[in-house]
């Protein structure tokens, strides 16, 4: 199924729908990591954003839940050049496609993610829409994109319950307003 990434400056990228088949408006950001896509997906700092991965092949080692930075993914959307549909890793428990669907996260594959990253680097972060609606009307969408605000992202990622981790050495308190699990573990 075709998908479209529409940016607030009117730029449109056409690709293939991945994950959930729903429309989202979000702030579009990029990540240049060559590995660690699951860590990116489960990093609370990406809440309220759609993440563009610049590395050209994503998903080749699958989903290994042990590597997650939190219990769930946080981005509103996911943007990749090529999505591996058959991961090869003895630790793999799932595919990114299934992971995105499970958490109702839409995405787009098959676009020039490096061109998108260059555009964002030159013009600054922009809002964008991921949609499968081929009958979109730019004149209606662009004002919505320009008016979009990510909202209260910190409230979404803030820990609501106290957690105690046993360790050696001095006692440390961590106020969790979106901390990755590995911060608490270290």
Where are these regions (language model features)?
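RNA-binding accessory domains that recognize and position tRNA/RNA substrates
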Residues: 1-186
């Amino acid at each position: 199924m075709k998908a479209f990434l529409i940016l607030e400056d009117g730029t449109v990228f056409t690709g293939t729908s991945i994950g959930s088949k729903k429309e989202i408006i979000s702030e579009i950001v990029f990540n240049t990591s060559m590995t660690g896509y699951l860590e990116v997906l489960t990093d609370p700092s990406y809440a309220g954003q759609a993440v563009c991965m610049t590395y050209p092949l994503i998903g080749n080692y699958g989903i290994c839940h042990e590597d997650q930075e939190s219990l769930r993914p946080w981005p509103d959307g996911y943007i990749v050049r090529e999505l591996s549909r058959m991961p090869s890793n003895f630790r793999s428990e799932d595919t990114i496609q299934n992971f995105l669907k499970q958490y109702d996260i839409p995405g787009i594959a098959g676009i020039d993610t490096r061109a998108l990253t260059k555009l964002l680097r030159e013009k600054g972060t922009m809002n964008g829409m991921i949609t499968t609606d081929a009958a979109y009307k730019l004149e209606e969408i662009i004002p919505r994109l320009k008016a979009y605000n990510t909202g209260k992202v910190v409230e979404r990622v803030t820990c609501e319950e106290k957690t105690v981790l046993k360790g050696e050495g001095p006692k440390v308190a961590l106020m969790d307003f979106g901390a990755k699990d590995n911060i608490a573990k270290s």
